[in-house]
């Protein structure tokens, strides 16, 4: 019979139970009681998620999709591959060890973190050296198998594949080619798979999303011998590709000695024909037809029409699935009591998507009539959404149509603007600043909660937030920073805050998704045309500026990041939606400038993240992304300084586009890579000013001034002192004030030391 399954379920819990359990564990110093509570929470969450999958009608539950912090790190723990610098015993790895690799400890900094393909999820980057070894690791996956079987479930295991695990890592300490480690890694996977078979697991989903990339020949050539080595003695293997088109590798994948393949038909519907043609008779084909990355309800009739010919060709060898893991969507729409009722009918979260998968399976097996009520309701909703008046704003459409190329360019060249800005601000060499946010303290959270609950009135809330702005300004002045920020106390999230104030956006109550570890975000829903009804940030920036003679930056989130970190409407091109957001931000920058704010930061941390996985599609994306930023930033005068910020990014392949943004100052995350990201600037003459991060804010570890000084000196090897800024990697929202106080004082001290050295070395 046609099988219904999903590639993975969100692990945070419907009420973010995992987040809070993790934070209690860390706060309690990883005590035995705290660890027991954390382990119990994980076990309860897995049981609940499997219950949802069973009740939806799926044919199996997925185990191995759970992770305490990150599934790539967990895979490394399974195969004994954590970085050697930590000195951990792979077979005796504890939760404390695992978290030390993720978050750093007193002896070692945390593992580097970067985006999982083109999503907003972050994984921990494996570290590979000539000395790297693999072997038996933790028992966690087998614990999950035993739990599922004890509850009576048929379990399919999920693992990050060996090729993807190597591809995602970084070569260090003289290792020339990561593939050289494959002969060491494959035996560890073989042993893991053999044990899964012994444990009674029939199917193992091996995630190899790198087959959606433009792979070098050496990596393609490694696929067949790898799976020829893995298949004997293993359960049935389902190799899963997702996030883009894998059709260029279709012949290779179909020839692998595995029991099935999975393809993503949401991101790359056209690839289906390449896989169905001459599909091997000994394989199942899992079709990812329900979107694992967006929240809009599936058009079941359309999906059924797409799958019916595949069913006719393959029969029971057709499996129905989500496009990718549901890690990227909220858990359950049932926890949205305050969401607009019409909008709510357009949505499906993870729990609803599991049922959509099962409903499509039922229609294929039993006929549409067997699930007519579900299909008819979905059809009515799809038609209503297409024609809803709340989606379309004629004024916005006219403004987008009237945009010209000149609207996306500053009036003067950078050299002219830089002179005007130097004259206006008079900053010292190596100016110091921060990226924007300061700690979201319990006081801030209590005030926000009281305001939302109606306990605190609007005036009381404003007064509470203004007090937090004053505290942030006073602290920055005490540190000796040169350029200040207001601290963003009023913002619960850098995208959601703006989504609450822009028309065309909607905000959920509980639509949380995991970003990394315990960090969760609540992406807004972009359901219609975007419009700015009134200024969003001017009052906060103006108040902060009134507290100091030093410049205070206005803080905005850029159009591409707003797009990338939201659930975006799927009824018009993303480029069009980006331009609508850019127009709203352009008006905000002009309002800030009019209010006397001379520096405006428009953050685009997701610019690189949005880059298509396929090289052939990147130029078009970068063209509209750069244009959107230009429209947002280019209405201001020459002496208004535009900043931007990017994080979690590899920049080498898009430096020309970053330069084309023409921001006066760009700050980037570089600490975890030990300034490696700046290597690209040795061959590309970046024309404007740049602030490479010198303090890793993702770790609770506080650097001293000597460490920061070393990083500044490394940056000076690539960036002229006249164009170098000193700042942390990212915003400081997730840190505690005691950490921030020590780190920023050290940063300012280090900058002063290096400034003195540079000035002393300058010709008289």
UniProtKB/Swiss-Prot annotation:
In the record's cofactor note, how is the cofactor described as bound?
Binds 1 zinc ion per subunit.
Record's InterPro entries?
A: Cbl-indep_Met_Synth_N, Cobalamin-indep_Met_synthase, Met_Synth_C/arc, UROD/MetE-like_sf
Gene Ontology terms: biological process: methionine biosynthetic process; methylation
Alphabetized GO MF terms: 5-methyltetrahydropteroyltriglutamate-homocysteine S-methyltransferase activity; zinc ion binding
User: What does the entry list as the binding residues for L-homocysteine?
Assistant: 435-437, 488, 603
Q: What class of enzyme is it?
A: transferase
According to its UniProt record, which residues of this chain constitute the active site? 698 (proton donor)
Q: Cofactor(s) for this protein?
A: Zn(2+)
Superkingdom: Bacteria
Function according to Swiss-Prot or TrEMBL: Catalyzes the transfer of a methyl group from 5-methyltetrahydrofolate to homocysteine resulting in methionine formation.
Instruction: Supply the name of the protein.
Output: 5-methyltetrahydropteroyltriglutamate--homocysteine methyltransferase
């Amino acid at each position: 019979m046609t099988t219904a399954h999903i590639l993975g379920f969100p692990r945070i819990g419907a009420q973010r139970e995992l987040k809070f359990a993790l934070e209690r564990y860390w706060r309690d110093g990883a005590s035995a009681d705290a660890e027991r509570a954390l382990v119990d929470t994980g076990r309860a969450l897995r049981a609940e998620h499997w219950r949802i999958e069973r009740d939806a009608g799926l044919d199996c539950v997925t185990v191995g999709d759970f992770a305490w912090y990150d599934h790539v790190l967990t895979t490394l723990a399974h195969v004994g591959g954590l970085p050697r610098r930590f000195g951990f015993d792979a077979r005796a790895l504890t939760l404390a060890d695992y978290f030390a690799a993720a978050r750093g400890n007193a002896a070692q900094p945390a593992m580097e973190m970067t985006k999982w393909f083109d999503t907003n999820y972050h994984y921990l980057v494996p570290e590979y050296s000539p000395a790297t070894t693999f072997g038996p690791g933790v028992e966690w996956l087998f614990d999950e198998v035993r739990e599922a079987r004890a509850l009576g479930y048929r379990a399919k295991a999920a693992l990050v594949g060996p090729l993807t695990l190597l591809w995602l890592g970084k070569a260090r300490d003289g290792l020339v080619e990561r593939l050289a480690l494959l002969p060491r890694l494959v035996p560890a996977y073989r042993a893991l798979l053999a044990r899964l078979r012994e444990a009674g697991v029939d199917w193992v989903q091996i995630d190899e999303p790198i087959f959606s990339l433009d792979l070098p020949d050496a990596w393609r050539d490694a696929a067949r011998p790898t799976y020829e080595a893995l298949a004997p003695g293993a359960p049935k293997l389902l190799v899963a590709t997702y996030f883009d088109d894998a059709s260029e590798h279709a012949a290779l994948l179909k020839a692998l000695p595995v029991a099935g393949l999975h393809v993503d038909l949401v991101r790359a519907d056209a690839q289906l024909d390449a896989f169905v043609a001459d599909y091997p008779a000994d394989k199942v084909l899992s079709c990812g037809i329900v979107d694992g990355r967006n929240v809009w309800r599936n058009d079941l009739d359309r999906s059924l029409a797409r799958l019916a010919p595949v069913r006719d060709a393959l029969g029971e060898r057709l499996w129905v699935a989500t496009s990718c893991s549901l890690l990227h969507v909220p858990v359950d729409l049932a926890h949205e009591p305050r969401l607009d009722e019409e909008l709510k009918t357009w949505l499906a979260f993870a729990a609803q998507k599991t049922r959509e998968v099962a409903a499509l399976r039922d229609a294929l097996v039993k006929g549409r009539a067997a699930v007519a009520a579900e299909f008819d309701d979905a059809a009515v909703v799809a038609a209503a959404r297409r024609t809803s008046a709340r989606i379309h704003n004629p004024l916005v459409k006219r403004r987008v149509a009237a945009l010209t190329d000149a609207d996306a360019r500053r009036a003067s060249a950078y050299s002219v603007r830089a002179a005007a800005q130097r004259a206006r601000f008079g900053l010292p060499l190596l100016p110091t600043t921060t990226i924007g946010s300061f700690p979201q303290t319990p006081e801030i959270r209590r005030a926000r909660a009281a305001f939302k609950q109606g306990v605190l009135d609007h005036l009381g809330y404003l007064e509470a937030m203004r007090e937090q702005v004053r505290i942030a300004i006073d602290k920055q002045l005490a540190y000796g920073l040169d350029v200040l920020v207001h601290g963003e106390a009023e913002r619960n999230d850098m995208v959601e805050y703006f989504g609450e104030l822009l028309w065309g956006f909607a905000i959920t109550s509980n639509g949380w998704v995991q970003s990394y570890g315990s960090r969760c975000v609540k992406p807004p829903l972009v359901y219609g045309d975007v419009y700015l009804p009134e200024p969003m940030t001017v009052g906060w920036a103006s108040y902060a500026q009134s507290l100091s003679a030093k410049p205070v930056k206005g803080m905005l989130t850029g159009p591409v990041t707003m797009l990338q970190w939201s659930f975006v409407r799927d009824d018009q091109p993303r480029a069009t939606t980006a331009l609508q957001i850019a127009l709203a931000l352009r008006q905000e920058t002009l309002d800030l400038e009019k209010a006397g704010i001379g520096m405006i930061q428009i953050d685009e941390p997701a610019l690189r993240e949005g880059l298509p996985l396929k090289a052939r599609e990147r130029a078009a994306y970068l063209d509209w992304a750069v244009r959107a930023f230009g429209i947002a930033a280019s209405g201001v005068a020459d002496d208004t300084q535009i900043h931007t910020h990017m994080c979690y990014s590899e920049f080498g392949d898009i430096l020309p586009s970053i330069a084309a943004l023409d921001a006066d100052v760009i700050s980037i995350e570089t600490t975890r890579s030990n300034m490696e990201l700046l290597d690209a600037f040795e061959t590309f003459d970046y024309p404007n000013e740049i602030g490479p991060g010198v303090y890793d804010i993702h770790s609770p570890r506080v650097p001293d001034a000597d460490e920061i000084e070393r990083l500044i000196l490394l940056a000076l090897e690539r960036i002229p002192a006249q164009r170098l800024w000193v700042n942390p990697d990212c915003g400081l929202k997730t840190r505690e004030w005691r950490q921030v106080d020590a780190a920023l004082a050290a940063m300012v001290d280090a900058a002063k030391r290096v400034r003195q050295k540079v000035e002393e070395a300058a010709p008289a």
